[in-house]
Amino acid sequence: MAIIPEIAPAPASGASRWRRFLTPWRSPADQPAWARPALLAMAALAAVAYVWGMAGANVEPFYGAAARSMSQSWHDFIFGAFDPAGTVTVDKLPGELWVQALSLRIFGFHIWALILPQVIEGVLTVLVLYRAVRRLAGPAAGLTAAAVLAVTPVTVLLSRGNVSDSLLILLLVLAADATCAALLTGSLRQLLIAGVWVGLAFQAKMIQAWLALPALAAAYLLAAPAARLRTRCAHVALAGLVTAVVSLSWMTAVTLVPSHGGG
């Protein structure tokens, strides 16, 4: 019986390697060819604007000290402690400070390491806003919305500081994106995901995160394709319950932890 030698696959040509390199940068088949390159270029420009001079940026010293303390102790990290002894907590929930503390734990205490999370959050917000608007109004409208957000002066300012607004905005835009997906499909799962995002936003800026709830709920009640209003109301109620559970999770956990004295 003749033995047929295995034929090694031909090495990829330069053209095929180039096509594979370009694939992530090309728009999906259902979008114009210019959509993804334009979005990525805009995100890159936003990133440059946000990081420009961030090593010498002014930061809030109170929250900077808290993030540093939290980066040095997991106990302080969990409880959002301001001081290394873990006796004083900050004046809000520590959602954004958790992200900053992780950055400091990885890179060390530097101003740029303190601001880096907000830069990333700002760029992600631009990308997610594009997707949310594109779902309902198309790529051109999505790109316009993303461009306006990217160049708004307050967006640049927040992305170059260490306050918690950047994380709040990102999470609420993620909630809006999930709600837009629910509007198109009537998906309860997407609406529950929106509730999770709002609950996480509560960890960043507390009750301010809930200000978006009436608009998100009204949009789903009025425009979702679910056949019966009763069904849509039930979906909104479940999403509200998820939001409440996620929002109150950290406060509940901290409240249930006994004090050192056991009292």
Where are the predicted features?
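Membrane-interface transmembrane helices that cradle and orient dolichyl/undecaprenyl
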Residues: 9, 140, 175-191
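Membrane-interface alpha helices of multi-pass inner-membrane proteins
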Residues: 190-205
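Transmembrane-helix motifs of polytopic, lipid-linked glycan transferases
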Residues: 116-136
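Transmembrane-lumen/periplasm boundary regions of multi-pass, lipid-linked membrane glycan transferases
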Residues: 21, 26, 59-69, 73, ...
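Short acidic/glycine- and proline-prone juxtamembrane loop motifs at membrane-interface regions
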Residues: 154, 160-167, 206-207
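Start-transfer (signal-anchor) and selected internal transmembrane alpha helices
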Residues: 1-49, 235-243
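Extracytosolic helix-loop segments that constitute the early lumenal/periplasmic catalytic or substrate-binding loops
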Residues: 62-106
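Transmembrane-helix signature of polytopic, membrane-embedded enzymes
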Residues: 40-45, 129-151
